[in-house]
Amino acid sequence: MARLVLGLVSCTFFLAVSALYSSSDDVIELTPSNFNREVIQSDSLWLVEFYAPWCGHCQRLTPEWKKAASALKDVVKVGAVNADKHQSLGGQYGVQGFPTIKIFGANKNKPEDYQGGRTGEAIVDAALSALRQLVKDRLGGRSGGYSSGKQGRGDSSSKKDVVELTDDTFDKNVLDSEDVWMVEFYAPWCGHCKNLEPEWAAAATEVKEQTKGKVKLAAVDATVNQVLASRYGIKGFPTIKIFQKGESPVDYDGGRTRSDIVSRALDLFSDNAPPPELLEIINEDIAKKTCEEHQLCVVAVLPHILDTGATGRNSYLEVLLKLADKYKKKMWGWLWTEAGAQYELENALGIGGFGYPAMAAINARKMKFALLKGSFSEQGINEFLRELSFGRGSTAPVGGGSFPNITPREPWDGKDGELPVEDDIDLSDVELDDLEKDEL
């Protein structure tokens, strides 16, 4: 009965915090499916809050944000992104904490961070100030946009994430590089190129973050850099080509949306990337860094070395390495430890009750984990990871609500374990009569 009441309370709490905004508010709910259309392609000034429903600061900001949206209605657009649900949008704009507020002005691909007060009045003042600046820029002929003609591409945030290439810089940057390059050949007057620009810029940012710069997106003005256009037979715009070290360039014939481009880039990355490292948990830095820098970290707790020997342990590690390679496109972190070596970690993840080996996958951002309940085999682990990759499977909060303490220890030396040597006790001076008296 207590569990039922607790479950109802939890559900009520979840519904409350997940509904910070509704369709009846003047705050426009933004998602990956409408963000580009509503914000990036809009001529309006936008204030966008990136929030998480469980965030206390976000909950306190909500009434003030609604108040500002009502006051600015038909003057400035006010939106909100559930960045906990739509992590791709948050990642695209470098959101690392909640709430984060960004102002999308003339240059939609280079929003400014809002650092003002959290009251409705302060938000409105900042919006009107940004609006005045936008109007002044337009009067002065400075659109600041990514698509502002022949020079517009180089003046936007794409200058950082979309690499502008020329006849002089192409070979050094692309052909001499170990990285994978996706290069768009465009003409400034081309309508299809203009439509592609925001998608290409958004994809460049996401790909850069997800591949750690190993896949790069670039652009070449083919009307200016005619040597390159001739070399690669560019006859229509836009033309996108993929360049990989030691291979002939191939045409990209996929979709023109951000998600299509990112998906292809990640495929290229996984095809060329080495398998992720499988690290032993020997200190807190390794454990926390691996989990905090990846969407998920997979933690395996293997039997004690005395139970398996080096051969048995290595067979487990081989299975883990094989699966790490199979799922490398996910860019998860991979960790392992020995049973009993990290008691607090095991306790926080509820590991040990089913015996060893055991496995859990941790989302350090949400402090939740999923536990492998099937067999610790290649097939069993693969089914577990496949469910996780589709966002399925049951999860639970990490015990204690924070990352558990890690006990420093020496790394495994790759050898069989040895039983501790018992000290020989000299009993020659001990009289048996005395022992009998002690026992009594």
UniProtKB/Swiss-Prot annotation:
Listed transmembrane segments: none
Subcellular location(s) per record: Endoplasmic reticulum lumen; Cell membrane; Melanosome
Alphabetic keyword roster: Calcium, Cell membrane, Chaperone, Disulfide bond, Endoplasmic reticulum, Isomerase, Membrane, Phosphoprotein, Redox-active center, Repeat, Signal
Residues annotated as signal peptide: 1-19
Active-site residues, record numbering mapped to chain: C55 (nucleophile), C58 (nucleophile), C190 (nucleophile), C193 (nucleophile)
Enzyme Commission number(s): 5.3.4.1
Region feature Disordered, mapped onto this chain: 139-161, 399-440
Biased composition (Acidic residues): 419-440
Site note Contributes to redox potential value, residues: G56, H57, G191, H192
GO MF annotation, one: protein-disulfide reductase activity
Keyword Disulfide bond attributed: yes
Biased composition (Basic and acidic residues): 152-161
Xref: InterPro entries: PDI_thioredoxin-like_dom, Thioredoxin-like_sf, Thioredoxin_CS, Thioredoxin_domain
Domain Thioredoxin: 21-133, 151-287
Motif (Prevents secretion from ER): 437-440
Quaternary assembly: Part of a large chaperone multiprotein complex comprising DNAJB11, HSP90B1, HSPA5, HYOU, PDIA2, PDIA4, PDIA6, PPIB, SDF2L1, UGGT1 and very small amounts of ERP29, but not, or at very low levels, CALR nor CANX. Interacts with MICA on the surface of tumor cells, leading to MICA disulfide bond reduction which is required for its release from tumor cells. Interacts with ITGB3 following platelet stimulation. Interacts with ERN1; the interaction is direct. Interacts with EIF2AK3.
Role, per record: May function as a chaperone that inhibits aggregation of misfolded proteins. Negatively regulates the unfolded protein response (UPR) through binding to UPR sensors such as ERN1, which in turn inactivates ERN1 signaling. May also regulate the UPR via the EIF2AK3 UPR sensor. Plays a role in platelet aggregation and activation by agonists such as convulxin, collagen and thrombin.
Protein family: Belongs to the protein disulfide isomerase family.
Protein name: Protein disulfide-isomerase A6
Organism: Rattus norvegicus
Taxonomy of the source species: Eukaryota, Metazoa, Chordata, Craniata, Vertebrata
Name of the coding gene: Pdia6
